Amino acid sequence: MKVSIRKISEITGFSPATVSNALNHKRGVNAETSEKIFRVAEELGYRMEEKIKKIRFVIFRRNGLIIDDSPFHPAVIEGVEHQAKSMGYETVFCHVDINDAQYQMQIGEILSDTESAVVLLGTEMLEEDFEPFTHAKNKIILLDGWSDRYFFDSVLISNTDSAAKAVEYLAGKGHKDIGYIQGDFRIQAFRYREIGFKRVMERYGLPIRPEYIATVGTRIETAYEGMKRYLDETPVIPTAYFADNDTIAIG
């Protein structure tokens, strides 16, 4: 049943005009009155008409080991900004760092802004990072990230299938010994790409040899250093490798 302003007025004892002004954050309503009206409105399940005025692009940062060097993310950000502009929305960009002392306050402000819709870049998010975002008062779209526990509208890359197609290509070219260069920071996307790698290797009956798996850093410099150490220590190498992402492959 739809909750009306008149119903809130009857329960709180304030006039419908006062209730309407409070719910729309207009001047002239004191803090105590506004707090009481919002409390009753929430208890009754009142939902205001949503008026989104801007897109807030939120870049979640755990350690920067993926997003700082990625050539993929700037293109994604540019695409979101372009599409938002074509629809008449301003795009506001902000970074939230889970290691920042102000992190909780920052996301609290972001998720209580009902005039903005949030596009959350979740590349570096782990499962334990999602819970605070379930309390958002505004709309959220999760980009390049997902939770196994909580529901979010999401836009994702098909990580498992993409990795499988890459390994199928190598197998189709006749490679029997295929190695895997994996990032040492195991974001969700990497774990699902690993599933795709193993799935195709098993399907083709190809061995997954521990000595053919190289674990390296996820930045170009650290990937290079890690791969150099691996090659120095590994006398026999496969004829081809699958890498978790382009940054690691370049390194």
Question: Where are the model-predicted features located?
Answer:
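N-terminal helix-turn-helix DNA-binding module of bacterial transcription factors
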Residues: 1-53
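Short glycine/serine/threonine/alanine-rich loop segments
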Residues: 14, 46, 88-89, 138, ...
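Hinge/beta->alpha junction and helix N-cap segments in small-molecule ligand-binding domains
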Residues: 61-75, 93-102, 155-165, 181-202, ...
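Periplasmic-binding protein-like
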Residues: 115-122, 179-181, 213, 234-248
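Alpha-helical recognition/docking segments in bacterial nutrient-uptake
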Residues: 54-168, 172, 230-232, 236
